[in-house]
Amino acid sequence: LIIDNQTHNVVGYIGNSDFNDIAHQGQVDGVKAIRSPGSALKPLIYALAIDKGLATPKTIITDVPVNYNGFAPENFNRKFNGNVAVEKALAFSLNVPAVKTLDKMGVPLFVDKLQQLGFEQIRKDSRILGLSVALGGCGVRLEELTNMYCTFANGGKFRPLQWLNPSNSTQPR
C-alpha cells in the first residue's frame, strides 16, 4: 500500500502478489486482512505519552522483569537493559518499557486513540483489550497502520485514506 502523505491518496495497492496462487493463499488481501501489528503500535504509545506529559524522549524507564497478573512481557532477545531512555526503548523496540508506558498512560486512552485513527477491529474488541496490545495483542489492517504512520507524517493530523477511482483518475497507472 502506497499513500501520498500530503493528500492521503492511495496511489498504489497490491493486496497479494498472485491472486490465483491457491497454495500460498493468493486470494487473501494483505492490505485488508486483519493481522497482529507486532511492535508497529509502539510509536503511538510513546507519542501519546509525550503528548500527555507522561514522558519525554529522555525519560528513563526501567527495562527489568515485570509481571502484570500473569502477563510478563519480555524483549525479543529475552534480555533486559536496566535503565533506558524512551528514545532508546523505541529505537530498539523494547517490549517492557512499551508495556510500562502503556500501563502508566492507561489502556482505555490508547484504545480510544486507535479508534479515533480508524482501527475498526480495535473498536470491536475495545472491551477486551489489555496491556498486550502494546506488543501486537490485537488485530489491525495494513491500511489502518499505514494511515496511522501517514498521520505522524502530517504532524498528527488524521484524515481518512482517499481511495482513487481509476476510471476518474487522470494520473498514469
Predicted feature residues:
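Extracytoplasmic
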Residues: N5, N9, A40-L41, T56, ...
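A short, polar/charged loop-to-alpha-helix boundary motif
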Residues: F19-A33
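Active-site-proximal helix/loop microenvironment
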Residues: F119-R173
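Short, charged, amphipathic alpha-helices and their helix-cap/turn boundaries
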Residues: M105-R123
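Secondary-structure transition/capping motifs at alpha-helix termini
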Residues: N5, N20-D21, I50-T59, E120-R123, ...
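Conserved catalytic neighborhood of penicillin-recognizing serine enzymes
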Residues: A55-F110, F158, S169-R173
